[in-house]
Amino acid sequence: MSRMVDTMGDLLTARRHFDRAMTIKNGQGCVAALPEFVAATEADPSMADAWLGRIACGDRDLASLKQLNAHSEWLHRETTRIGRTLAAEVQLGPSIGITVTDASQVGLALSSALTIAGEYAKADALLANRELLDSWRNYQWHQLARAFLMYVTQRWPDVLSTAAEDLPPQAIVMPAVTASICALAAHAAAHLGQGRVALDWLDRVDVIGHSRSSGRFGADVLTAAIGPADIPLLVADLAYVRGMVYRQLHEEDKAQIWLSKATINGVLTDAAKEALADPNLRLIVTDERTIASRSDRWDASTAKSRDQLDDDNAAQRRGELLAEGRELLAKQVGLAAVKQAVSALEDQLEVRMMRLEHGLPVEGQTNHMLLVGPPGTGKTTTAEALGKIYAGMGIVRHPEIREVRRSDFCGHYIGESGPKTNELIEKSLGRIIFMDEFYSLIERHQDGTPDMIGMEAVNQLLVQLETHRFDFCFIGAGYEDQVDEFLTVNPGLAGRFNRKLRFESYSPVEIVEIGHRYATPRASQLDDAAREVFLDAVTTIRNYTTPSGQHGIDAMQNGRFARNVIERAEGFRDTRVVAQKRAGQPVSVQDLQIITATDIDAAIRSVCSDNRDMAAIVW
C-alpha cells in the first residue's frame, strides 16, 4: 500500500513539474523550461512526454533518447491530459532532422543517434523492427536511417542497395530526405570507384540557382529540388562529393569549381579546404570483396588487405590450380625429361616448406630457375604450368605469369635501370616473372662487352633474386649456350638459379602430333596421306642443317612450325574447296574439314620458304 502511495506521489510530483515546464516553455522558452522537464523525469522516469520535452529543449544526451524510446508507449498521456502538443527535432542522417511526435519516429531518431554513437549493431536491430513503419511518412525516413548506418560503417554496396530500394506507392516523399539519400549514395559509389554512377545520383538533386540536372530522369526515378539556404550542410556536401568525383575521373578543372562551392555561409568546409589545397587528395576506393572480408561487419579496420584476400583466394583454389598446372604440363607433347624434372621439383618444394615450418635451413635453395632449349619447344607453356603449380603449392599467390623484356628493366640512361628493376620486382612479389631470351637483358658492344645500362639492371636483379628468393619466382629462358654465356657477365648470377630444365627439339612424330592437336579444335583433320607427307617432310627438315649450323627444325621453331603449317594448309584447303564449289561439284562437311597431302605439302614448302636459312633444303 505504501509503495502505491509513493508511486502516486511520484506521478503527481512529476506532473506538477511537467505542467510547469510546458507553461514556462511557451512563455520563457526552452532554456528556462528544461530544468522542470528534468525534474519531471527524475520524479517519474517513465514519463515519456517529459523525456520528449527534455529533448525538445536541447537535451542531446543519447541516454535521454534511449529513455524516451523505452517508455514511448506512454507518449501523449500527459499532453493529452492538459490539451497540449509537444514535438522535438532530432538529427537523422548527416545533415537533416526528423520531427518526433510518436513512438515510431522516436525509434527512427534513436537508430540514427545509435549510428552516430558507434552502436551499430543496436541501430541495425532497431531498424529491423517493422513497427517503425506504422506511417507512410516513415518509409523514406527509414530508408535514410538505414543508408546512413551503412554510410557511417563504410558498407558502400549496402548504401547503394538501400538507396535504390523502391518505396511503396503510398509512401510520402520529402525533397530533403531524397536529397540526403542521393548524397549518401553518391559517396558510396565514389568510394567503390564508380564515378559515373556517383554523378548519376548527384544529378537527381537540383540545387535551386546552382544546378539543374534532374530533368533527364524519368518519372520512375525519385528526384529533388532544394534551396541553397534550406540545408546548407547538405548543399555543401553535394558540391564536395561532386568535386571529388570529378577528381576521380581526372577532370580537375571541374573538381576545383565544385570544391570551391562546398561552403556554409560563404566559408569552405574543412574537407573542401583540404581537397583544394592538395590536388592529389582523393577519396579512398575499396571493393565489395574487401568489405565482405571484415571480421566485424561494422568495423572497416577489420577488413583484410588485398594481399590477404589474394592469399585466401589462392588457398581456396590451391587444389584446383595444382591439378590445372599438372594437366597443362601433361597435355604437352613429349617433354618427358621436363615433366619428370617438374615432378621432382614439386617434391623438393614440398619438403622445403616442411623444413621451413620446423625452422630447418634451406641454404642454396630458391624459387628461380632457367628453361633452356630451342624455340617452340614448350618453354612458355611450361612456365604457365609452373605458375599454376607454384600457386597451388602456396609458393606464389598469383598463378598468372608476367612476361617481361629488357625494356621492363632498363631505362634510357645510366642510373635509371637500377630503380626500374627494383620497382618491377617489388610489384611482382608473389608472382612469376618469365623472360624469354633472358640474355637480351644486356646488349653487347662491337668488342663484345655488355652495355652499362643492361649491366645496371643485371646487378640490381642479382640483389633482388637473393633478397626475395622465396617471395617470387623468376624464370629465364632461351638457348642454353647463350644463357650460359650470359650468366658469366656477373660471377654471382648463375648461383641465383639452382635448377635448369632442358628442352630438346621435337622429333618428327611429335611435330606431327602437335599439328594434329592444334588442328582438332579448329575442326580440321589431316587424312592419313597428309600425315605421312607431314612426317616425311619434318624428318627431312630435322636432318637439315642451316648455314649457321642450326638444326632445321630449330630454325623453324619446332612446335610453332607445326601450328604455322596447319594454318597455312587450311588456307590451301579453302582455296581448293572454293574451286570445287565454283566448278559445280558438291561440297560436303568432310570436304570443309579434311587437309589433304597436297594441302600439307604446299603448306610446308610455303612456310619454309619464309625462312632464308631453309633456302638450300632439298625435298
Curated annotation (Swiss-Prot):
Q: Does the keyword Nucleotide-binding apply?
A: yes
Write out the GO MF terms: ATP binding; ATP hydrolysis activity
- Keywords for this entry? ATP-binding, Cytoplasm, Nucleotide-binding
SMART domains listed in its UniProt record: AAA (SM00382)
Q: Name one Pfam family in it.
A: AAA
The entry's localization annotation reads: Cytoplasm
Tell me where it mainly resides.
Answer: cytoplasm
Cross-referenced Gene3D superfamilies: 1.10.8.60, P-loop containing nucleotide triphosphate hydrolases, Tetratricopeptide repeat domain
Which InterPro entries does this entry report, sorted A to Z?
Answer: AAA+_ATPase (IPR003593), AAA_lid_6 (IPR041627), ATPase_AAA_core (IPR003959), CbxX/CfxQ (IPR000641), CbxX/CfxQ_RuBisCO_ESX (IPR050773), P-loop_NTPase (IPR027417), T7SS_EccA (IPR023835), T7SS_EccA1-like_N (IPR049078)
Positions binding ATP in this chain are G373, P374, P375, G376, T377, G378, K379, T380
Record's Gene Ontology CC terms? cytoplasm
Q: Which family does it belong to?
A: Belongs to the CbxX/CfxQ family.
What NCBIfam families does its record include? Answer: T7SS_EccA
What is the stated purpose of this protein?
Answer: Part of an ESX-2 / type VII specialized secretion system (T7SS), which exports several proteins. May have ATPase activity and might provide energy for the export of ESX-2 substrates.
Subunit comment for this entry? Part of the ESX-2 / type VII secretion system (T7SS), which is composed of cytosolic and membrane components.
Its protein name is ESX-2 secretion system protein EccA2
